[in-house]
């Protein structure tokens, strides 16, 4: 999958923020991201987190035949893998230019600097030596892979323990971990890589660039150094021309950062060794907290907003005072009102107005059936009452038989009013009825 390029707006935003000495995550120019080191249950297994960049390191060993030109030295082998789990742009099973450059830089930093005593890895000269293999897997990519990989490699080598061996004549005996305690590697110093990103043709400088900052940078300078301020390797990429003063300034900054990282590594190794001796719980399950994958979530970053607050106060002080707030609604014409924030609405009740309209218009259409009696003596005014049921039928007359105790059945004829007969009288008789009422 091809990497998604940055838009022009994002690129201009990043460059403008760098010109103002600001970064997206709130760091200063020379600040490193938080470094966290976790160890597994086996020796030589660790995970290093540099911000959101995560690298897994695993060290293994085996007895092999030495090289012909170096019969008394062991073999060191480094392998870095970039999987699609770290970033979709990485293609599996393909040696990209970035991967080749990172592997070569790791070999120059760790193997060519002689940080590990390879002669101590020899078992029988010219026959058996230890081959130490360091496998590094990038789990998540958020920029500055080389720094995280170098820290993971040196931490895994310091934490690793090889099995103990003994030689009697031509026989080589390999002891298990239960028979003898494993032996740590002989490490002289800890070389650590520190990356510097340059922008605007070397005008601006950032330490530990993130993934987005790497996309807009013009060049990269990597300095590998130990805590004794000895430069192990230095590499510049990007095609920019650096001055001698710039390189010296970067080396001084790298010396300070390397001392801090070395102290962090030694403290993590001591804590792990202490927990293992005391018989406590150790491993990734105990040292790494549960993490949840969330979408549309922004992490809080400590950002200094004092300058923004000062500008806001200046704008408010220079602005004109606000006009007086009207506390009551202004009625411009009858039947109108003003709706605003903090003002109570003064609209009339719609139900009351509707009832008044119904009373005025319904008086003309009222049905007055008082005093009207049918031949049967049943008053029509009782039709709408709840006690007397309304019977709708097409027939004019019906026969009803009433059964009473100790009496003969009686037949009573009642007259029902059909639905077509119950009609509202016209307006003329209603008006006459009103006149009669007025006369009375």
Swiss-Prot record:
There is a cross-link at residue 297 (Glycyl lysine isopeptide (Lys-Gly) (interchain with G-Cter in SUMO2)). InterPro entries: ExoRNase_PH_dom1, ExoRNase_PH_dom2, ExoRNase_PH_dom2_sf, Exosome_comp_Rrp42_subfam, PNPase/RNase_PH_dom_sf, Ribosomal_Su5_D2-typ_SF, Rrp45. The modification Phosphoserine is found at residues 65, 306, 346, 393, 395. Residues 353-362 have a biased composition (Acidic residues). Its main location: cytoplasm. The keyword Repeat does not apply. Residues 425-440 have a biased composition (Basic residues). It is found in: Cytoplasm; Nucleus, Nucleolus; Nucleus; Nucleus, Nucleoplasm. There is a cross-link at residue 297 (Glycyl lysine isopeptide (Lys-Gly) (interchain with G-Cter in SUMO1)). Keywords: Acetylation, Cytoplasm, Exosome, Isopeptide bond, Nucleus, Phosphoprotein, RNA-binding, rRNA processing, Ubl conjugation. The keyword Membrane does not apply. One of its GO terms (molecular function) is mRNA 3'-UTR AU-rich region binding. The modification N6-acetyllysine is found at residue 297. Component of the RNA exosome core complex (Exo-9), composed of EXOSC1, EXOSC2, EXOSC3, EXOSC4, EXOSC5, EXOSC6, EXOSC7, EXOSC8 and EXOSC9; within the complex interacts with EXOSC3, EXOSC4, EXOSC5 and DIS3. The catalytically inactive RNA exosome core complex (Exo-9) associates with the catalytic subunit EXOSC10/RRP6. Exo-9 may associate with DIS3 to form the nucleolar exosome complex, or DIS3L to form the cytoplasmic exosome complex. Non-catalytic component of the RNA exosome complex which has 3'->5' exoribonuclease activity and participates in a multitude of cellular RNA processing and degradation events. In the nucleus, the RNA exosome complex is involved in proper maturation of stable RNA species such as rRNA, snRNA and snoRNA, in the elimination of RNA processing by-products and non-coding 'pervasive' transcripts, such as antisense RNA species and promoter-upstream transcripts (PROMPTs), and of mRNAs with processing defects, thereby limiting or excluding their export to the cytoplasm. This is Exosome complex component RRP45. The lineage of its organism: Eukaryota, Metazoa, Chordata, Craniata, Vertebrata.
């Amino acid at each position: 999958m091809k990497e998604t390029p940055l838009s022009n707006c994002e690129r201009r935003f990043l460059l403008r923020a760098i010109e103002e000495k600001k970064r997206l995550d709130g760091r200063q120019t020379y600040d490193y991201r938080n470094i966290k080191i976790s160890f597994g249950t086996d020796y030589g297994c660790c995970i290093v987190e540099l911000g959101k960049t995560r690298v897994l390191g695993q060290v293994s060993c085996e007895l092999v035949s030495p090289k012909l030109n170096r019969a008394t030295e062991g073999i060191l082998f480094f392998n870095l893998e970039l999987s699609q789990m770290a970033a979709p742009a990485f293609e599996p099973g393909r040696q990209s230019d970035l991967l080749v450059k990172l592997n070569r830089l790791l070999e120059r930093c760790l193997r060519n600097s002689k940080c590990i005593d390879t002669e101590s890895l020899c078992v029988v000269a010219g026959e058996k030596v230890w081959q130490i293999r360091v496998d590094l897997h990038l789990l998540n990519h958020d920029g500055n892979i080389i720094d995280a990989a170098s820290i993971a490699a040196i931490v895994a080598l310091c934490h690793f323990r090889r099995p103990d061996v003994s030689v009697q004549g031509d026989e080589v005996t390999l002891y298990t971990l239960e028979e003898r305690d494993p032996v740590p590697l002989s490490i002289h110093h800890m070389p650590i890589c520190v990356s510097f990103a340059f922008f605007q043709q070397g005008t601006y400088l950032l330490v530990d660039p993130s993934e987005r900052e790497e996309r807009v940078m013009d060049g990269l300078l990597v300095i590998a150094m130990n805590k004794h301020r000895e430069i192990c390797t230095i590499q510049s990429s990007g095609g920019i021309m650096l001055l001698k003063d710039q390189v010296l300034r970067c080396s001084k900054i790298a010396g300070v950062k390397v001392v801090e990282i070395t102290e962090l590594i030694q403290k993590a190794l001591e804590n792990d060794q202490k927990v293992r001796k005391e018989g406590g719980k150790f491993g990734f399950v105990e040292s790494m907290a549960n993490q949840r994958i969330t979408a549309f979530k922004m992490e809080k970053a400590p950002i200094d907003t004092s300058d923004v607050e000062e500008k806001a106060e200046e704008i408010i002080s220079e602005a004109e005072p606000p006009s007086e707030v009207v506390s009551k609604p202004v009625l411009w014409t009858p039947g109108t009102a003003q709706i605003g924030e903090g003002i109570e609405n003064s609209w009339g009740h719609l139900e009351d107005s509707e009832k008044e309209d119904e009373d005025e218009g319904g008086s003309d259409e009222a049905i007055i059936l008082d005093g009207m009696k049918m031949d049967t003596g049943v008053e029509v005014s009782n039709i709408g009452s709840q006690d007397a049921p309304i019977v709708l039928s097409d027939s004019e007359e019906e026969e009803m038989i009433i059964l009473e105790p100790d009496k003969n059945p009686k037949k009573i004829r009642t007259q029902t009013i059909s639905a077509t007969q119950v009609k509202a009288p016209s307006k003329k008789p209603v008006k006459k009825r009103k006149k009669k009422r007025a006369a009375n």
